[in-house]
Amino acid sequence: MQTLSSILRTIAPLDSKAMARATTRLDGLLKPQGSLGRLEQLAIQLAGMRGLYGHQVDRKQIIVMAADHGVYDEGVAISPRVVTMVQALNMVRGVTGVCVLAANAGAEVKIVDVGIDSDTLPGVIDMKVARGSGNIARGAAMTRQQAEDLLIASATLTLQQAAGGVKVFGVGELGMANTTPAAAMVSVFTDSDPELAVGIGANFPSEQLHHKVAVVRRAIETNQPDASDGIDVLAKVGGFDLVGMTGVMLGAAAAGLPVVLDGFLSYASALAACRIEAKVRDYLIPSHLSAEKGAVIALNHLQLEPYLQMGMRLGEGSGAALAMHLVDAACAMYNNMGSLAESNIELPGCVN
């Protein structure tokens, strides 16, 4: 069995020489240099990932981590707790938002139970740590050992999927009340006041946001997470779904493969992943700007600029599914465009 240290040791920086070669190729394609903007930058980023060869991304997969949260008992969500289980089963049926959007993008969806308050669910990968995390307003979400074990299990699952041929990963989550621990994590990692990180989540009444802010503030004061220690923050004020997504990011980076972020929840996990191993950031592809209040703070801290701005806050991996189309487009552009030299065209400043 792998250890967390052994997984982290395999995470390498992007290949700068491969990226330079990709830049030269892009500059010689049938277009003015840089005219495809961030699509070119995405192709260059992908070129630096050792797990990809020839910009071939034919197999894409979104891993959705599902779990319930003890902080639900503080009245920070309006959806019934059982919705986590119901939606997990709906994902198995392929009828949720992420499933429809992923199918449209040619991506698979894997739903993983890391802490749903239910018995084993058919069609769902069982990696359950417990039936819900601890109530972070009154104590830790989990033990440090539970967090480390789940990071290893999630990263190992990702590495296994990579060995089976997956070339692009996306992350998603499912769990009632999970924007509360995510806001706590973002607040801690960015050293921001909880009021700046707490949003309405799944339509939480705006007039009650002060209560949600107070719960997040109490969680941080109660647990005193160490912002310099990603695992400590996950264990004290996170949740099993947030830990699971962090593990997917570590595993994808260890495999030298891209991982497409989703929304606010995934930003919280990305902050943890980058705190655990800074090189993970090289492998992150930001999909969309979440409509959640703390999104900009988190993304600014990560120094990531999302590709899409759709006003979305569904979660599940829905934004990751949309951005899979951009990954395909970047690779199609890189592989299939003709060159200036082939057409005997010379443009000022272009490489023939």
From Swiss-Prot:
It comes from the Bacteria. Pathway: Nucleoside biosynthesis; alpha-ribazole biosynthesis; alpha-ribazole from 5,6-dimethylbenzimidazole: step 1/2. Keywords: Cobalamin biosynthesis, Glycosyltransferase, Transferase. It catalyses: 5,6-dimethylbenzimidazole + nicotinate beta-D-ribonucleotide = alpha-ribazole 5'-phosphate + nicotinate + H(+). The active site is at residue 316. It is an enzyme of class 2 (transferase). GO terms for molecular function: nicotinate-nucleotide-dimethylbenzimidazole phosphoribosyltransferase activity. GO terms for biological process: cobalamin biosynthetic process. Its EC number is 2.4.2.21. InterPro entries: Nict_dMeBzImd_PRibTrfase, Nict_dMeBzImd_PRibTrfase_bact, Nict_dMeBzImd_PRibTrfase_N, Nict_dMeBzImd_PRibTrfase_sf. It holds the Pfam family DBI_PRT. Catalyzes the synthesis of alpha-ribazole-5'-phosphate from nicotinate mononucleotide (NAMN) and 5,6-dimethylbenzimidazole (DMB). Belongs to the CobT family. PANTHER family: NICOTINATE-NUCLEOTIDE--DIMETHYLBENZIMIDAZOLE PHOSPHORIBOSYLTRANSFERASE. This is Nicotinate-nucleotide--dimethylbenzimidazole phosphoribosyltransferase. It comes from Yersinia enterocolitica serotype O:8 / biotype 1B (strain NCTC 13174 / 8081). The lineage of its organism: Bacteria, Pseudomonadati, Pseudomonadota, Gammaproteobacteria, Enterobacterales.
